[in-house]
């Protein structure tokens, strides 16, 4: 994608940038940002969803729980990770790890990059809606600092299930919306070919969402996009995480939870 296109990116071009197959995924950022990472598997109920990776990480001698929705770097890995569309067991695995973080008082860092939760019959039979709803409830009251970063696509409830947090950040050319532009166009106009038009009215860019105070900060991408300089992008994210933790350091638990609750209660006042 040309530098000129990046520079003048409108909403639809940002959709294309966010979906770029060369864009760094959650696995890359976890390995690049943290000094050590031990992956943990399974939801202790059905299985291990490869679309969500999570575990315990170290950064500057501090322990974290890290969870990320992960796309693949090639076709084979994309099939393994279901193109970043989690099943309910993925969301339950994520919640299991975050409740473990609460037990051991570890901050939680989430990376979000998904077109949406998987909507296959099996996923619905295993309680996809319930799994997402349970995450929303539990994250709102999780008794540790929570940071969520949208690194590519933030699609619908599948993204929100890992994005109820004290601090929500978006990369400069990422998107976050209730559904895809194609889905919006299909529902509203019965014509998915009008996706570009839909993107322009949906207010899905980081810049739009920051203006509504839905997110807290936009993390600047290297010139040409995150995929042009992944190492630099990881450094920018790392710096932002450490700054956010510094801001929350010393905040008592009641204040942390009240501010998190009010953050979401007040969103309607900004729309």
Curated annotation (Swiss-Prot):
The Gene Ontology biological process terms listed for this entry are: fatty acid biosynthetic process; malonyl-CoA biosynthetic process
One Pfam match: ACCA
Q: EC no.?
A: 2.1.3.15
Q: Where in or outside the cell?
A: Cytoplasm
Q: Which UniProt keywords apply?
A: ATP-binding, Cytoplasm, Fatty acid biosynthesis, Fatty acid metabolism, Lipid biosynthesis, Lipid metabolism, Nucleotide-binding, Transferase
Q: Which reaction does it catalyse?
A: N(6)-carboxybiotinyl-L-lysyl-[protein] + acetyl-CoA = N(6)-biotinyl-L-lysyl-[protein] + malonyl-CoA
Domain named CoA carboxyltransferase C-terminal: which ranges?
Answer: 1-247
Q: What class of enzyme is it?
A: transferase
* Family stated for the protein in its record: Belongs to the AccA family.
Q: Which NCBIfam families match?
A: accA, AccA_sub, PRK05724.1
Q: How does it assemble?
A: Acetyl-CoA carboxylase is a heterohexamer composed of biotin carboxyl carrier protein (AccB), biotin carboxylase (AccC) and two subunits each of ACCase subunit alpha (AccA) and ACCase subunit beta (AccD).
Q: Which PANTHER family match?
A: ACETYL-COENZYME A CARBOXYLASE CARBOXYL TRANSFERASE SUBUNIT ALPHA, ACETYL-COENZYME A CARBOXYLASE CARBOXYL TRANSFERASE SUBUNIT ALPHA, CHLOROPLASTIC
Protein name listed in UniProt: Acetyl-coenzyme A carboxylase carboxyl transferase subunit alpha
Q: Which taxonomic lineage is given here?
A: Bacteria, Bacillati, Bacillota, Clostridia, Eubacteriales
- Gene of origin? accA
């Amino acid at each position: 994608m040309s530098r000129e296109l990046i520079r003048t990116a409108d909403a639809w071009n940002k959709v294309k940038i966010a979906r770029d197959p060369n864009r760094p995924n959650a696995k890359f950022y976890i390995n690049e940002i943290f000094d050590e990472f031990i992956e943990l598997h399974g939801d202790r109920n059905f299985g291990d969803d490869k679309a969500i990776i999570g575990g315990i990480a170290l950064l500057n001698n501090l322990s974290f729980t890290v969870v990320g929705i992960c796309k693949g770097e090639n076709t084979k890995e994309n099939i393994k990770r279901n193109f970043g569309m989690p099943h309910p067991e993925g969301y339950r695995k994520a919640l299991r790890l975050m409740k473990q973080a609460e037990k051991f008082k570890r901050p939680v860092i989430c990376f979000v990059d998904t077109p949406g939760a998987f909507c296959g019959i099996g996923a619905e039979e295993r309680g996809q809606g319930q799994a997402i709803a349970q995450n929303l409830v539990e994250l709102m009251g999780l008794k540790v600092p929570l940071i969520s970063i949208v690194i590519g696509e933030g699609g619908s409830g599948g993204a929100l299930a890992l994005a109820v947090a004290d601090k929500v950040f978006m990369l400069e050319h990422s998107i976050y919306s209730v559904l895809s532009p194609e889905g919006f166009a299909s529902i509203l106009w019965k014509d998915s070919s009008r996706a570009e038009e839909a993107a322009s009215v949906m207010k899905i860019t980081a810049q739009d969402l920051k203006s509504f105070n839905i997110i807290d900060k936009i993390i600047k991408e290297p010139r040409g996009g995150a995929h042009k300089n992944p190492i630099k992008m990881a450094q920018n994210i790392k710096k932002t995480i450490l700054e956010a933790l510094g801001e929350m350091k010393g905040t008592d638990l009641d204040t942390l939870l009240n501010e998190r609750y009010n953050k979401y209660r007040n969103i309607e006042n900004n729309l």
